[in-house]
Design a protein with these regions (language model features):
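Glycine-aromatic micro-motifs
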Residues: 1-145
């Protein structure tokens, strides 16, 4: 998004639980990889990097850095209902593309991993409906607001 049409990141909120993918950084490139990860995730100041215990599918428990949304950030939206954020996602675009494209990319990654999230599915339905109403020809253009 942009300052005029801010997008919405889909981030973790403190205190919840989630299912996801944990990545182990290779020892030989740990410092370089962690530096890249840190720069990418911390550039906006939206996250609180937090050490968390993760329960892996194989029964192991590991410690990992998890980037949790900072509720004090000025762009934080506490109301995560689909009817509130779907219009923002459907309308927002920026130099890297549309916010809807970001959402659809996340959907595809979750499908590849065999994961499903009911809240995300509700959001996808709402955004697709808004886009269909505003782009009847099916061509996704940056921002309609």
């Amino acid at each position: 998004g942009t300052a005029h049409q801010p997008g919405r990141m889909l981030a973790l909120k403190e205190g919840g639980r989630t299912t996801g993918v944990a990545y182990r950084l290779p020892e030989e490139t740990l410092e370089q990889e962690l530096t890249l990860l840190w720069k990418r995730e911390m550039i906006t100041g939206c996250y609180l990097p937090t050490w968390c215990q993760l329960d892996l599918d194989d029964g192991r428990t590991v410690n990992a850095i998890v980037f949790i949304m900072d509720p004090r950030h000025p762009e934080y939206e506490s109301d995560t209902r689909a009817q509130v954020i779907a219009p923002l996602i459907a309308a927002a675009s920026g130099p890297l593309g549309t916010n809807a494209q970001y959402l659809f990319s996340l959907e595809q990654e979750l499908i590849k991993l065999g994961m499903q999230d009911d809240g995300l599915n509700e959001l996808l339905v709402s955004v697709k409906k808004l886009l269909a109403e505003n782009y009847p020809d099916g061509v996704l253009r940056p921002g309609f607001a």
